[in-house]
Amino acid sequence: MCVKKIRKASIWATGSYLPEKILSNSDLEQMVDTSDEWIVTRTGIKERRIAAPGEYASIMGAKAAEKAIEKAGLTKDQIECIIFSTSAPDYIFPSSAALAQAYLGIKEVPAFDCMAACTGYLYGLSVAKALVESGAYNNVLLIAADKLSSFVNYEDRNTCVLFGDGGSACVVGESRPGALEITNVNLGADGSVADLLSLPAGGSRLPASPETVAEGKHFIYMEGKEVFKHAVRRMESAAKICIAEAGLAEGDIDWLVPHQANERIIDAIAKRFEIDESKVFKTLSKYGNTAASSVCIALDELLQLHVINSGEYLLLVAFGGGLSWGAVVLRQVEG
């Protein structure tokens, strides 16, 4: 009898790209009615990176992808599919995936965007996992990048202190020694509360017009207190389900790699799962909220700074507009 091998998808390598320009809290003090103490106390953010002219989501993502492909030991010609998670695409169309493909010089493979706001990396990871495990593709390039500085109102102290720009990427393929196996994924969304976090204008519902520009409809809108409550509750629920479906106890998680939105949210999740502070990886103070790219940027930095031991489990959690949320459990494969 022929027994078909069950394919398991894993992250082979990661990469990240951060713009050079730093926007510090002291810089913001000169722009809006705020202070370093106010920002740090409420968010944990000290500075964030801002893309230069000519640095778009597609470019930042592609630069991160070059690092991930090299670390995976692949050539660009071996990439078979490109997924690009972003909420700040270069254009409505063509896709940022296609633009990144052209920048990278990857020829005529499928390339498409995935939009789930700050949860975009986890959504993209779920799609990449399915494509690899189904046998459709062997090597999938997942990019997550955002340039939210293009949509920030630097006269609104409640939102301008939060966001930064950046790009990230990972290569997903069949599980191999030394890789991070994508053990389980749990995702969710609730469009009935979509208005709590949005960028109202610029789409087909509110096309750009003098009125939408004058009314500030092209800037990020957020009801912070309500978003906070949803974020903690939804990420906790997704994480519990994901951990249980992986056949694990909550105490089995070795590292927490959360979406870098707000230190209070991160600390609340860590507390609920009793994860020691030393095992909660944060980049928030340096980069702020880099939206879809934040989890993968943090994961890439974690892998550069720490040795993940064989058999250790990582929990990724994220929350964003939609409202959308998700959790992913990764396991370090031996070797």
Curated annotation (Swiss-Prot):
Keywords from the named record: Acyltransferase, Cytoplasm, Fatty acid biosynthesis, Fatty acid metabolism, Lipid biosynthesis, Lipid metabolism, Multifunctional enzyme, Transferase
Source organism of the structure: Chlamydia caviae (strain ATCC VR-813 / DSM 19441 / 03DC25 / GPIC) (Chlamydophila caviae)
E.C. code: 2.3.1.180
The protein, known as: Beta-ketoacyl-[acyl-carrier-protein] synthase III
Complex formation: Homodimer.
Lineage: Bacteria, Pseudomonadati, Chlamydiota, Chlamydiia, Chlamydiales
UniProt-listed SUPFAM superfamilies: Thiolase-like
Domain of life: Bacteria
EC category name: transferase
Cellular compartment(s): Cytoplasm
